[in-house]
C-alpha cells in the first residue's frame, strides 16, 4: 500500500483542530500554503495553486496523526500540542519521514511540536524513520519536550539531497525523552536547544502574529508528556478513543437528563455552567471552563 493519501488539506488562518484522529499513509496532513512553484512538473499543487501564498496559523491539540512518508507537510506556522505522531510500517530500510516542511524564507516559525509523542506501530524497525526532510530549503521544525520512540533515526533529519538546506533549514530540539531522545548523533546542521532557547517556542509566541492570537487564551496546563505509557502514547489518546460506544451512550443519557426546563435568564446562566461541568466530567477534561460562554 502506498501513494499519496491526504486526509486533511488545511489552508487558512487561526485554524484549531482538537482531539481528532487524522490517518493516512503518504502525505496525510497538508498545512498550507503551497510553495510558490513546483520543483518539477507533476509535483504537488493542490486546489489553491493560483491563490496568493499566505502563511496561516494552525493549532493541533490532543490529536493522533499517522502515516509513513512526509505525512505532515506544508508551509504553515503550525503548533502541535500533546499529540501522538504515529509512524506506520512500509517494510523498507528507510521506513518513512514524519515531516516535509516548506516554510517560506524569512518566516520566524514553521512546525513546532510541544509535548508530543512520536510512536510507531508494531513492526516498524528501530532507527528507520527520519523526523523530517526539507520540502523547501528553509524548512523549520522544532521539537520541545517530546517523547521519541526507538523507530526514530539517530541522526534525526535528512537533507533530501539539498545542500542549501544546511544553511537555511532550521531543525531544533530540546528536552527530549524516550529511546531516541538523545540528540548527540543528530546531523551537525540541526540545533540542540537549551531550556532558555526552548522558551522561545511557547505557543502564545509562535501563534501570536500581528493580532496576538492564542487559541488557549493564556498559559496552558501541562501536557501529558510526563505521564506517558511505556510505548509513549499520551494519556488523552486512550481517554478519547477507547470504548466509544459506551461514551456515546453516556453522552446521550446525559443530554436527555440535562435538557433546560426552567424559564428565567438567571436559570439559563446557571444551567450553562452546570452543563459544562457535567460535560467536563464525562470527557475527563479540566479546560472547558477557561473559555467564556459566547453567543455565536
Task: Please provide the spans of the model-predicted regions.
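A broad, low-specificity signal for short, low-complexity segments enriched in glycine/proline
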Residues: 43-46, 103-108, 229, 273, ...
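Sequence-level preference for short, compositionally simple segments enriched
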Residues: 1-222
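Extended hydrophobic/Leu-rich segments
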Residues: 196, 223-226, 235-237, 272-275, ...
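Non-catalytic accessory segments flanking enzyme active sites
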Residues: 245-296
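Mature N-terminal, pre-catalytic/accessory segment of carbohydrate-active enzymes
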Residues: 221-258
Amino acid at each position: 500500500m502506498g501513494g499519496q493519501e491526504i486526509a486533511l488539506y488545511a489552508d487558512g488562518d487561526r485554524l484549531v483542530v482538537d482531539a481528532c484522529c487524522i490517518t493516512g499513509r503518504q502525505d496525510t496532513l497538508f498545512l498550507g500554503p503551497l510553495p510558490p512553484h513546483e520543483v518539477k512538473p507533476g509535483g504537488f499543487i493542490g486546489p489553491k495553486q493560483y491563490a496568493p501564498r499566505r502563511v496561516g496559523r494552525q493549532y493541533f491539540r490532543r490529536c493522533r496523526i499517522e502515516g509513513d512518508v512526509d505525512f505532515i507537510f506544508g508551509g504553515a506556522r503550525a503548533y502541535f500540542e500533546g499529540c501522538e505522531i504515529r509512524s506506520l510500517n512500509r517494510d523498507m530500510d528507510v521506513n518513512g519521514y514524519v515531516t516535509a516542511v516548506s516554510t517560506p524564507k524569512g518566516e520566524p516559525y514553521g512546525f513546532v511540536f510541544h509535548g508530543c509523542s512520536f510512536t510507531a506501530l508494531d513492526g516498524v524497525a528501530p532507527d528507520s524513520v527520519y523526523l523530517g526532510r526539507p520540502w523547501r530549503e528553509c524548512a523549520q521544525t522544532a521539537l520541545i519536550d517530546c517523547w521519541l520512540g526507538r523507530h526514530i533515526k539517530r541522526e534525526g533529519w535528512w537533507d533530501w539531497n539539498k545542500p542549501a538546506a544546511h544553511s537555511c533549514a532550521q531543525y531544533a530540539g530540546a528536552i527530549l525523552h524516550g529511546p531516541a531522545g538523545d540528540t548527540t548523533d543528530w546531523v551537525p546542521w540541526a540545533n540542540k536547544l537549551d531550556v532558555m532557547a526552548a522558551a522561545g517556542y511557547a505557543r502564545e509566541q509562535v501563534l501570536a502574529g500581528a493580532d496576538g492570537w492564542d487559541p488557549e487564551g493564556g498559559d496552558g496546563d501541562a501536557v501529558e508528556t510526563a505521564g506517558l505509557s511505556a510505548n509513549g502514547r499520551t494519556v488523552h489518546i486512550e481517554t478519547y478513543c477507547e470504548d466509544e460506544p459506551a461514551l456515546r451512550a453516556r453522552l446521550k443519557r446525559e443530554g436527555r437528563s440535562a435538557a433546560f426546563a426552567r424559564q428565567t435568564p438567571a436559570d439559563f446562566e446557571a444551567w450553562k455552567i452546570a452543563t459544562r461541568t457535567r460535560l467536563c466530567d464525562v470527557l475527563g477534561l479540566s479546560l472547558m471552563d477557561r473559555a467564556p460562554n459566547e453567543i455565536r
